[in-house]
Amino acid sequence: MDTPPMPSLLWHKPGVAIDANIQTFLAADDVLLDREFFLYDITASTAHAQALQRIGLLTPDELDNILRELQHLTDEYRNGTFLLDTQYEDGHSAIESRLTERLGETGRKIHTGRSRNDQILVATRLWLKDRLTQLSTLNRDIAHHALQRAAAEQHLPMPGYTHLQRAVVSSAGMWWAGWAESFIDNAVRAADTHALIDCNPLGTAAGYGVNLPLDRPHTTAALGFARLQVNPICAQLSRGKFELAALEALGSATLDLRRIAWDLSLFTTSEFAFITLPPEYSTGSSIMPNKRNPDVIELMRATHASVAAARTEIEQLLSLPSGYHRDLQNSKGAIVRGFKRGLAALELLPALLSRLQWRPDTLRAAIDPGMYATDAAIEAAIAGIPFRDAYQMAAKTADTAAQGRTPETSLTARRSPGAAADLCLETLRARWHTLTQPTSDPDPR
């Protein structure tokens, strides 16, 4: 079915009919996804208008009028007066349509020297910078809570497991310190990824530049980018690749979230009974009155699947030659879904970590005699017996290895750096304090 073109179709050619089904397929849910990026798009349009005025393509009065209308559009979008919906093909066309509606010919100048390609590149780049800043902050917060608990509970004995089998005497402090260091690593990765993508693609147009002396250094500074993304072809190559890098940084954190949630899921079972969760982190059963289910940590555990799925979707989209291809439109939905689920789950973790309670008696009772066998083997090796012989001796006497030993003496003896008697918390704290917190301009929302 052919229908008259929407006024917001920037690419429409006179005399060419628009098939409604094809247009629906092309647009998909693009305009709805652009609600995530719309205010960033307006911010970039402001910088672009300033750059046009600096090379004489807008008069000072025209610039003032455009900036005023862009601010009005921002205000109306925030308060719900302006609705970005399917009457527009996408957020870019909505901005140009509004400026044209309010300013006539002046509004029609806003797209001079830019393409929707670099327009969405810069909007998503600003969006990703903010999300990576949030991710870095969350990683730092999680590490901070874990460090606090490591210091408070470094002498609390608990079983250490390999293969989900009891292995050696460990401590709650060591468990906490392990997560602290891992989330410090995650914060570093988020900051490094922020630095990678902190470059300005605006002004690269459709991927080959334009025959205008665009003031790209101005837009770089105005938008708070650390540097210019120089080559237009590289700018197009970075679409999807930078989104993939951001999701990998997020996935590093949600992978650890999945594993700590696994630990907590096990530790809350009656078979382990190592911890007690705050009541608001569990729900009841619809049929079994006796049940309290750890649904929150189970859904935390499941979050990484959503992030990994988003990453895989973008990776598959990138099976492309150089230059822009419409396939890349689908990368927007992937990053929105991935970051929405990932950040929401990570936001719940600091409070949970600060409030869960260990059950010391149960922890101690789970330490069986065989868990001292490694200590016995190493002590024999220190006394001069070759370790492999000491190992065999300790294996034969594992059932009685606890004689003369306590969990505390085992922990005290583990003096290798990072082990229970020397958690190196000051080293971890120093590393935490030197984390580079990425900065972004205030979120335009």
From Swiss-Prot:
Cell compartment(s), UniProt: Cytoplasm
A GO CC annotation given for this chain: cytosol
The protein's annotated pathway: Amino-acid biosynthesis; L-arginine biosynthesis; L-arginine from L-ornithine and carbamoyl phosphate: step 3/3
Molecular function per GO: argininosuccinate lyase activity
InterPro entries: Argininosuccinate_lyase (IPR009049), Fumarase/histidase_N (IPR024083), Fumarate_lyase_CS (IPR020557), Fumarate_lyase_fam (IPR000362), Fumarate_lyase_N (IPR022761), L-Aspartase-like (IPR008948)
PROSITE patterns (UniProt xref): FUMARATE_LYASES
Alphabetical UniProt keywords: Amino-acid biosynthesis, Arginine biosynthesis, Cytoplasm, Lyase
One annotated GO biological process: L-arginine biosynthetic process
Coiled coil: none
Catalytic activity: 2-(N(omega)-L-arginino)succinate = fumarate + L-arginine
One of the Pfam families matching this protein, by short name: Lyase_1
Disulfide bonds: none
E.C. number(s) listed in UniProt: 4.3.2.1
Membership in a protein family: Belongs to the lyase 1 family. Argininosuccinate lyase subfamily.
HAMAP family (alphabetical): Arg_succ_lyase (MF_00006)
Entry protein name: Argininosuccinate lyase
Species name: Xylella fastidiosa (strain 9a5c)
